[in-house]
Amino acid sequence: MPPSPPSSAAADQWNIDYVNEDHLKAFAQALSYNDVQPLDGDSSPLSPRSFSLPPESPQLSTASVKAPPPTWKYGPDNGTLRSGRDTEERVEKLTATSDFAPIHQRVSRKRQRATSQGLTYNVIRWPLLFFIFFIIYLEFSAYVITRQIVNIFEWLVAWRGYKAKLRKELRKAKTYDEWVNTAKKLDKHLGFDDWKDVEEDSYFDWALVRRVRRTLTRLRAANDTRGLMDALAVCVRANFAGTESVKMYSETFIGTKKAVEAHIKEVAACLDYVRTATDVSLEEKRAFFRAVNKHYGSSALCLSGGASFGYYHFGVIKAFLEADLLPRVITGTSAGGLCAALLCTRTDSELKELLVPELADKITACSDPFTVWFKRFRQTGARFDTIDWARRSMWFTRGSLTFKEAYTKTGRALNISVVPSDRHSPTILLNHLTAPNCLIWSAILASAAVPGILNPVVLMAKDRSGNIKPHNLGGSRFKDGSLREDIPLGSLHTQFNCNFSIVSQTNPHIHLFFFAPRGSVGRPVAHRKGKGWRGGFILSALESYIKLDLSKHFKVIRDLDLMPQILQSDWSGVFLQRFSGDLTLTPRSTIGDWFHILSDPDRPQMKRMLRVGERVAWPALGMVRNRMTVERAILRGRSEVRTALSHDRTSNDPATSLPETNPELTGALDHVPIESDVDAGFVSRSRRARNKTGSKGGDTPEEQLNLAGVFQLDESSKGVRRRKQKKSGMPLVAEPLGELPEVSPTHSPIATESPQRNYTSNFGDSFRHVRAPSLPALSSPFRSIRSNTSSSSNNVQSPSSSQRFRSQLSITRWFGGVSESSSDEEDEDLGGLQSGEATASSGEEGIPTFQLDSAVESHSDRSEDEMLHSGANVKEEYQSEESEGKIPIPGGERVTQEKIDSSMASGERLRPAGGSKGSAKTPPVQDGA
């Protein structure tokens, strides 16, 4: 189907000129400064402060312009030397950077002789290096031959007959729907559908997944929101029980086991149920979604370098865009940085208009003829001109946008990896957190500054006045980040909590070594029903052995420092860094791509690259969709709870999309920030706002009065207080509810602190409860420490508190993600109690426990000993409910904080259909039983 003609808005995108000549002049001046001889004052790029724009810039007044730095002239035609102290022009001698690159590089006059590393090193270094390279050459030849034998074996043995025909149709599919239909035919023909139906498998904990899914369904049917939150806190984790393992998606062409699909759908449905529940406060929801978001993490799309091979990334981006599965965190290096910049500076609607073959008309970086770039290479040591590349790249970055401005516009976090020109400086990941005011086009140039291709560049940034100045961040000049860290997974995990990485790998020197002997995502082994080895076990083992031995030789070269510096760069880590992620996509390149590795694509080539990139991404969409289903359910909860806390309203539709105030923009400020540290600022602002009004407890005096009347705490309790500034509290002994005491609007009751949780033991106890035959044992996985406490004779108890009960307090105290001094946690602790008759008894270490006599007792309110004692009754209860078919899966009502407060004040709670009063009649187990 031919593409539709571009709209008027799209036509404007193609014709807009984003070039800013003033910014280019400032960039040229920054490049002219000498790195070796530091200048005095604040005009040095090596100093913390940045120098001013050139005098001809209209953005600065003449009074603010600094004196120009001394001029450096070099070469045979530098003019006649003048003597005297008033000499303004200085002459500097030239020396070659290395024998491999005799370029015009300014160096200091006085060079200290380096200390020798020893006679043995100098004598053995070069013979050992040549010997290792000879071994590498032999092993690489053997590796190429092995791979070709594997291809011949699969062509002769594996892909024959009808499945070979289906495979050709799969590779020629033009749309995702065509690919899906052919993939289903292949799964049916090869018998992979039978593998999907069988629940048991050794690659994941199928028994645990089944029990968790059944438990979540029952808790959701019983309207036990807090029990559901407890269970979700355990199972909403990255790769829980192996459900996100690549092996689970490498046995079929499309999809995975039905048990895994059902588990993911149930988890997403439970998250939406918690989001729309009315029997928990908004503060509890906020703490819960923050905790599960921290455990589950976020996804990231990583675009590697690869010169002209990197344009395959556009096809991968298009496939994820059309499937609405683009992650919010995007990173790119070198050529991938250019693709990532286009992705993160345009909205979805704009990208759909730009990802067409006509995009090749805007890629003109390599358009200079041979005579021009060869002369430039002889003079400067680089094939391309930095200023010319800056001018051409401004269209992709939408002018001089900064990282922060791009994040504000699209909601996507752009990350560019760069390396300082110094050999021992660490890699720097530029984004809206580490370099918010840095210009994206300068970061792209720095990331593409491969030695010999482009000289190291200076990063540029906007100041408070909007002027362009050098950005000194860990160095003065930067170069290609793929030399050391092509895929910055460690920095992404630290800054954005990325636990799932999607890597599009196009580096030509790495692409050949990607080989999956047991199949990859959406590409199973064709013979032995997916259980065999590609090319047989012997060839697969030989391929793995040769590849590991090659890596060993490169590590020896790096560790012994045998590799000389070529073009002032260390190339020893080019083959030793990590180039893969949790899900790695390798577009299928051709031999012709090697001959155009530094050439611009035309429209036919761009059309082919877009199609190849889409086809390599289609098999992975099923795995990414399952991951994004849970991730976006968490994001919906966080987003709507934050909106409700600000505007006291939230949507109840589980299918509600993320809010967008401006239809033309993604509206990043309306979304929940990706980085988790921003929530700490949200809590801090809430605390400061309440301190200004003098309120330390409820938001209003009425709320404080209601909360104070629910229970009173005994001053004899010596438990640790959550609020350190509160050194005294209300009595602990419970009194009959009569006339509520008068409470000052500025006084708040003290919330007790739950016992310190030992997550090492509790996490194992949680799984023990999941495997228990009785359902309610799962409902409180974080309450297992109650078994460690025993009754004390000096505990103060009321007559009706002889039985031990666990309080159903705030979810905030069950996780460790919120500050202990947060006043919001106090409100959650107090707001989590239902009104009604409550009795308190102090347990060990002065920790009170509460008995809540509400209309219907939730299963999660019962102690674990009580659950084990009455497990048979609970089982019969649920079996009777299931047989009668009276377990509804409720939707959500419209939730507001006023409705939650009113339901809490009246003592109302949601009753599960079919009745669950029988569980309340079970006699509890006494202490010490």
UniProtKB/Swiss-Prot annotation:
Q: Where is the composition biased (Basic and acidic residues)?
A: 856-878
Tell me one Pfam family matched here.
Answer: Patatin
User: One GO BP annotation here?
Assistant: lipid catabolic process
| Protein's membrane topology | Single-pass membrane protein
Q: Mostly located where? A: membrane
Function text: Probable lipid hydrolase.
Return the protein name.
Answer: Patatin-like phospholipase domain-containing protein CNE02340
Organism taxonomic ancestry:
Eukaryota, Fungi, Dikarya, Basidiomycota, Agaricomycotina
